[in-house]
Amino acid sequence: MLTQLTINNFAIVRQLDIELAKGMSVITGETGAGKSIAIDALGLCFGQRVETSMVREGQERAEICATFQLESQNPAYHWLSEQELQDPDNPTECILRRIINADGRSKAFINSTPVSASQLKEIAQYLVHINGQHASQLLLKNDYQLQLVDNFAAHPELLVKMREDYQTWKNLQNQVKTFQQKVAENEARKQLLQYQVDELDEFNLRPNEYLELEDEQRRLSSSEQLTQLSQSALQILSENDTVNIDSLLYRATQYIDELAELDPQYAEVQNMLNDALIQVQEATSEVQNLSSNIEQDPQLLQEIEQRISQTLQLARKHQVKPEDLVEQHKKLKAELTALLDFSESEEMLIEQEKRAFEQMQATATALTASRQQSATRLAQNVTQSIKQLAMENAEFYVELNTDLDKVSANGADNVIFTLRSNLGQQPQPLAKIASGGELSRISLAIQVLTSDQSAIPTLIFDEVDVGISGKTASVVGKLLRQLSERCQVLCVTHLPQVACHGHHQFNVEKFTVDNKTETKMTALSQAERVPALARLLGGSEITELALANAQEMLDLVH
């Protein structure tokens, strides 16, 4: 709960330091005295936006500090631990501090550690809930009505799961859209690839085939020339009857043999010529073999030349060298396979998106069931409360409209608060039928009921009793006091019938010092509360009757 609030140089507050206790604390004062200024300052500790006008005129900076005492089961206690912001010497204490400079810059601290404004907002949701004087106007908005039903239902885990399931589905839906867009963009490419791959598959060029075809084509196209050249070579080597290398070498070896017998120095020459003769004879035999295998097949040559021509044509089409066409075929196949796999991935993603949507609908259905149950109870409880607030013939209803085909992060429900003000009338939406006073009373009843379901330790009601008076105001005070038995209640009010129900009372006064306006807030003793209430009852002049009435009001409550 909030135990201390210190304010320095904020607006018309020069210095303020108040201590707060359990139960119901009321803040009272004359109209225009600045009763809500402490609540406004407290809002800065919860991360609200700063303005330069917030700094007291003539001062360099304003500073607001709020001290909370936490119980170990409070989510704020665990949040501080997770964020490593706990005071190791006093882990159950949480001090929020905000400094605003005159130039508009600000600093935020939690337990003396610098933090961001968003971190202040995050922890604030576990510490305080402020019910403002404009809540009755918010009551006309369907989104706010849904929020109130959820607050009363007290199913935060279900709301978190709803948001998570919705986000999961939304992410998958976006992925599907992206995939489908890419698939559409790739369709033309896929069709072209399929045609190209089919064409190359049918052509079926083997690795190195083109080079082999070139060699074979050269051989076949030169067969006549090869035959002629081979015959000419054979003539010179051995087949010319007049003169040939074989016979000449043979005759030479005979002469050298005789020389070697006469002179051993010719032995080496003898060996060389014998080797040469063997080489010539082997070469002759090889040429004879090769020439006998020379093909002259015009049809085969035509087929090979046609295959080469087709290869060159395909290579030009794909803008590669003929010898690289096989590798190009592999690349195109790989790209086509990737696009086909991409289409399969899209189908898998669509199936995932479908399952996520079904899961989201299931969570939305569970959320609807919880809301329907709490909506019935809320309507009954609000009806009971507003009857106590001088709306004896009124009936309050909560209509829940569900469309599982239009699920959002908040579920599939649309809430409408309706009211039957008088007997014999049909219920109508609040915006069409409720007066300002009725809205204030309904709003207050709902705020008390929904706050009662909350685990937040401190509830602030900032002039929520606008538009009511007399006996109705007394009932409001009683409701707030009952609520303070379960949590700390801070109430800004101008009604004595509400103020008298407080366990503690603070009075706000506005005065002038050195031509500068200041506001101060003072904690009142029980004795001091009597004239303060009397002033609320009778204005600036406090009569004996007003004092007696004020004392009686306090006696009846306490």
Swiss-Prot record:
Family: Belongs to the RecN family.
Cited InterPro entries: DNA_recomb/repair_RecN, P-loop_NTPase, Rad50/SbcC_AAA
Biological process terms in GO annotation: DNA recombination; double-strand break repair; SOS response
GO cellular component: bacterial nucleoid
Official protein name in the record: DNA repair protein RecN
Name of the encoding gene: recN
Record keywords: ATP-binding, DNA damage, DNA repair, Nucleotide-binding
Purpose: May be involved in recombinational repair of damaged DNA.
GO molecular function, one term: ATP hydrolysis activity
Classification via NCBIfam families: PRK10869.1, recN
Keyword DNA damage: yes
Residues reported to bind ATP: G29, E30, T31, G32, A33, G34, K35, S36
Gene3D superfamilies from the UniProt entry: P-loop containing nucleotide triphosphate hydrolases
CDD domains noted in UniProt: ABC_RecN
